[in-house]
Amino acid sequence: MSDTSPDYPTLQSIGWPWLGPPEEAAWQAVFAAHPQALPARVVEQHRTGYVVADTPEASVKAESLPEWQRPRFPSHERAAVGDWVLMEGKRIVALLPRRTSIKRGAAGEHYHQQVIAANIDTVFIVCGLDADFNPRRIERYLLLVGGGGAQPVVVLTKADQTEYAEDALAVLEELEAQNIPLRAVNAKDPDSVAALRPWLGDGRTAVLVGSSGAGKSTLTNTLLGTQKMKTNAVRENDSRGRHTTTHRALIPLPSGACLIDTPGMRELKPTGEEDLAEGGFSDVEALAAQCRFNDCAHIAEPGCAVRAAIDAGELDPERVANYMKLRMEVASAAEKLATRVAQNNRGKGSGKRPASVDRPGRH
């Protein structure tokens, strides 16, 4: 780690968004509050702490802020892989504002959010063209990405192992019509993976998300040109794999981009902040706005534009059913979020943190 002044050209090689000092007022304010601190990026996140770097070649274990160790501290306010922090020696002294992120409602009874990755330009939603192929799961990922500021790109792997690649692409035509890029690749073939180059330019950051066994680690190895990430075989009966990646990590690529690999996620719960129109359902939302009744359930109501589109073969009924399910989940999560915010506000007024606020998420 540098102990003198920021080396901005080197920081750019791990995703620093400016040619020199920060240009956003919110970042400038944090820098001003810590004049002796230097910027670094969180490149690994473990249950026991963080690893940060200010160059592509070197990283160090970092001592986190004391408040992050408190059991009730909101998990989404802790650093995540991709975050920029200010360091004094090996100690994190401040978390810089996030420019973009992808997050989910974390598993568990109590409401809390979990940041999957921060300050990312592109989210590669990876799904295998085998028994793992699931358009509904892809739609769920698109919902979580929508509104977070990053560009979603659907990557269908194992294009060399199936005769159904064209059928899968046909199923996803509705998403492509909404300008959501789709690419089918052989994750082991560098020439095939080259289709992802437009999103992996110098200084850009991308994150790979998808279920275990989808081919994320294989894709990472191909992009790196080396077998850095461990890969496991998938079960033939259901195409599911064991978790190859056990923690989130940011990896510099030869192209000059940074790639964040993530473990497979079983639960993809909304946070309540999602926008269905931005999350892959803009066409359904536009039709819903044309329904005769504002509270139309799109089942059998007269004047339902959504049902009319289904009957005309213009919308996939399974996709609409998933839209309805996700809409209910977002509404339910939004209610829980509103309740938590109200509890937080009451807690601030009394000088105490309420008992029901964020619990630590899984790192």
UniProtKB/Swiss-Prot annotation:
Sequence similarity: Belongs to the TRAFAC class YlqF/YawG GTPase family. RsgA subfamily.
Enzyme class name: hydrolase
Native source species: Xanthomonas axonopodis pv. citri (strain 306)
Main location: cytoplasm
Gene this protein is translated from: rsgA
Gene3D superfamilies named among the record's database cross-references: P-loop containing nucleotide triphosphate hydrolases (3.40.50.300), Probable gtpase engc, domain 3 (1.10.40.50)
Key words of the record: Cytoplasm, GTP-binding, Hydrolase, Metal-binding, Nucleotide-binding, Ribosome biogenesis, RNA-binding, rRNA-binding, Zinc
Protein name from the UniProt record: Small ribosomal subunit biogenesis GTPase RsgA
All copies of domain CP-type G, residue ranges: 112-268
InterPro entries: G_CP_dom, P-loop_NTPase, Ribosome_biogen_GTPase_RsgA, RsgA_GTPase_dom
